A protein has these predicted regions:
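Active-site microenvironments in enzyme catalytic cores
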Residues: 1-28, 35, 41-202
Length: 202
């Protein structure tokens, strides 16, 4: 399948990968969006122009939301139908390909917009799903000879995660502050942490 939008064939955002997100456009206008190549597409305006009229169950103004939560709650049949419709619209010789006015109003270079958190995450649970990670943590906090808890292989071990730690890609990370005690001082001091660890969540 070819698109009328020119993009690098090595791009992560081809016509076969239609992601959903939320972006801040010009004049602080916020809408749900998708992307192909380096172009971000305003789905709310596409909806207003009737390009999704044949999709059943798609609520009016659904793409004007500040998160994708309501859209996701419509269920897989609806979100899949929208994704297939977007692929159809982005294809060569589609009705959108010939609509210069809509393209001008709905298509923006990635440098012209700012991405937001795509979903509201009120809470989440983190799991020890890697035996290497669980073993390393066990060595730090328990007997290194018995680092892995006996129940680890028999039930999922989870713990409460901090939703505030989930941020948009590219967000600056603020180094935490707390107490540290230099070896040459009698009392601890307050300041930025000396070391910072991080995890990649997938």
């Amino acid at each position: 399948m070819k698109s009328f939008v020119n993009y690098d064939q090595n791009s992560d955002f081809s016509i076969y990968n239609i992601p959903f997100g939320v972006a801040v456009f010009a004049n602080e206008y916020i809408a749900c969006c998708t992307r192909i190549g380096d172009m971000v597409i305003d789905l709310a305006t596409l909806y207003d122009y009737g390009f999704f009229d044949d999709i059943e169950g798609l609520n009016e103004n659904i793409f004007e939301a500040y998160t994708l939560n309501e859209f996701i709650e419509l269920g897989k049949p609806v979100t899949k139908a929208v994704r297939l419709k977007i692929q159809e619209l982005l294809a060569e010789n589609s009705k959108l390909a010939l609509d210069e006015k809509t393209i001008e109003e709905c298509f923006f270079n990635i440098d012209q917009i700012r991405m937001m958190m795509p979903v509201h995450i009120p809470n989440y649970t983190d799991f020890y799903s890697s035996i290497e990670h669980a073993t390393n943590v066990g060595k730090m906090f328990r007997d290194p000879a018995n680092a892995l808890l006996p129940n680890w292989k028999h039930l999922p071990v989870g713990y409460h995660g901090r939703a505030s730690s989930i941020v948009v890609s590219g967000t600056d990370i603020i180094r935490p502050k707390g107490q540290t005690k230099p070896a040459d001082l009698d009392s601890p001091i307050f300041g930025p942490s000396k070391q910072l660890d991080f995890e990649l969540e997938m």
